[in-house]
Amino acid sequence: MPADRPAFWLGNPHADSWPIYHHYFHTENEEELRLKIKDDMRWICPQFFPGFYRDPLGRAPFSRPRSPKQKDALLAPLADCESIDEVEAFDWPDPAYLHFDDTIAALRNTGNFYRLSGMWTSFYHDVMFLFGMENYLIKMYTDPDVVEAVTRHVCEFYFAANRLFFERAGDLMDGFFFGNDFGTQQDLIIGPEQFDRFIMPWFRKFTEQGHHHGYQVILHSCGAVHKVIDRLIDAGVDCLHPIQAKAHNMDAAILARDFGGRIAFMGGIDTQDLLINATPEAVKEDVRRVKKILGPHLIVSPSHEALLPNIPPQNVEAMIEAAFENEISENNQ
């Protein structure tokens, strides 16, 4: 039965935004707010839970610094790596240290909502971190076999981790949601030829893994990724998030023209300008526009899930109100 409106996801607001929302919407916790605004989705990722990876030395997989306080994080440990032997000698994370009890419990306690889960599986970023960004891009040309070997180790960890998690999660989740930011504001970070060689082989394995376990596959990829959306569709991506509206060729009208009916889109409500600076009525008008263009192939959501505190709560409310207006365009069904 066709939906009478697109689904809505608030996203995963920045920690500093929640107090603002609670004050404005008169709520006390995240779930109360999501219930009040009728959010259709819940994202429950293993990496959200402390202790999901219990390495004897206290390390996280592919430990990356998230703030200046994290002084113990390795910085580009493979920056000077030039041989397969060095790759094989590296101390790679072990899936045996993974613990999913907290994630499974949270999934069990989730109500009747669409449940996004699975390891974040950010293999592109992890490989980039291990080499350092500049070295990673250079080594694609100077040492491609080394890049492929490191990619294999990172991806084998995530593939094993997801297999263990999916076997436990079963039907407690609906969509495998994972993220790799392939784009910048203007274009891809790497060219299509390098994308096909270093990204797509393992990317396809992950989408196939998600489908094998009965899940829809939702990819988070910020930036201007228009050039590879056909490849993502061919690889089995069911839904693309977050649709960075101001990035090159990522407006809803262009996406509908080039990919309409072949993939769903989650996001598209601009967080770079519109939600920050526009009036609530202008926000509503743009939500209506995006809904009319993408119709039932849209999940209304911000163009970046981590809503920052510089977005007025009145504009968040306007986005929500327009999302729930029954204005699916019949031309897009």
Which role does the model predict for each range below?
Residues M1-Q333:
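Catalytic cores of TIM-barrel enzymes
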